[in-house]
Amino acid sequence: MDRPANERTSALAVYIGIVQFFFAVTWTVYVVYLPQLVEQAGIARSWVPWILVADQVVFAVVDVATGFWVDRVRHSIARLGPWILAVSVLSGLAFIALPFMHASPALLLAAILVWAVTSSALRSPPWALLSRHAATPRLPWLSTLTLTGTALAAAASPYLGMALRGVDPRVPFLLSTLTLIAAVGGLVVAERRLVANSPAAENLEPQPKQQVVLFYAALLVMALGFQAHFSLNSAPQYLRFATPADLAWLLPVFWIGFNLAMFPASRVVGRLGALPLMAIAAACGGLATLGCAFAFTKPLLLSAQFLAGACWGAASVAAYTAALRFGRTGREGRFLGTLFAVLALAALCRIAVNPSGLAAVAEFKALLPWLPATAWLAAGLLLIAARSPKRS
């Protein structure tokens, strides 16, 4: 691809990153207000975690189905952008309706289901769109640009949660939806500029099935470790040295490391390969999570959290690059959909810890500080086993 084409592809990745940012913001708004919404609809707040678990189940199933659908229609649909925009508008209408669905539990749950199903248009399809127009050597860099949006939203979520206290839910639901749809509109325009300048299709050999299976198994194990570390362990670790009010300023350190590490990682992927980089990141990240568990000063904890975030950032760039390369045989959708489904399953397991009563089990409490490191090191071993003579 020539330089102008590369610039247009980078612009498309930036637009997708912006879409991912605003999509992640809508999820934060949803989680913040869900207890209030279910209570207004006559549902006990104790059901909130199970509703979130159900959301993740829907995400996992629909993401895989959407991925296969994208692969099936890739030759019959010239541009994915308009389809993504149309489904996003439907998803946005369902999302805006949530604060008004207090007449009955059934209405609220139906609106949540519609939103959960249609929001799949904003996960794997934009990535498949990017893969359609990108040359293989640029995938790590473009993945980094896209993931930056998600990382920034994750870093901002504690501040957003504080800012939304006492705000009428109808306001953030409306504003977040409008900004998201506007961002998707920009994505449509960016895609239109690229259609006439797309790279020729690359006929790469499919990866060995065993390697693909081991990759997704490793990703699931590593994602479980990430969920245990960041969502279950990080706050208690910080509270050894800080107050609850400080958490909003301390938790984003992980995501700062994540974001900064992605940029050099995008270059390392091209030299080492995606799976070897994931394995190295998993091993280093496992040691970093142990450092978090046993840090005896606040500066040491902050440093270990930063390093853990950096390792997860490098692993994420490698994972998305690997999934995109696995799909370069015309099956980008299914591999990306499976990646998002794996991440949803890991989130599901983390959310279910508290309502299932597992968090109160003494044995689980004793093992929890060790779980992230164990999971990440196990993922590293799976990735070593998955490595083939050819780079992923």
Locate predicted features.
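Structural signature of the two symmetry-related core transmembrane helices
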Residues: 80-96, 276-291
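Hydrophobic core of transmembrane alpha-helices in multi-pass small-molecule transporters
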Residues: 94-98, 104-122, 300-314
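A late C-terminal transmembrane helix in Major Facilitator Superfamily
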Residues: 330-360
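A membrane-interface helix-boundary motif in multi-pass transporters
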Residues: 79, 162-179, 354-376
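Intracellular juxtamembrane helix-capping segments at the cytosolic ends
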Residues: 121-134, 314-328
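Helix-loop boundary and gating motifs at the non-cytosolic
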Residues: 2-59, 212-218, 222-240, 247
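C-terminal transmembrane helical hairpin of 12-TM major facilitator-type secondary transporters
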Residues: 275-316
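Helix-to-loop junctions at the C-terminal end of transmembrane segments
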Residues: 62-78, 261-274
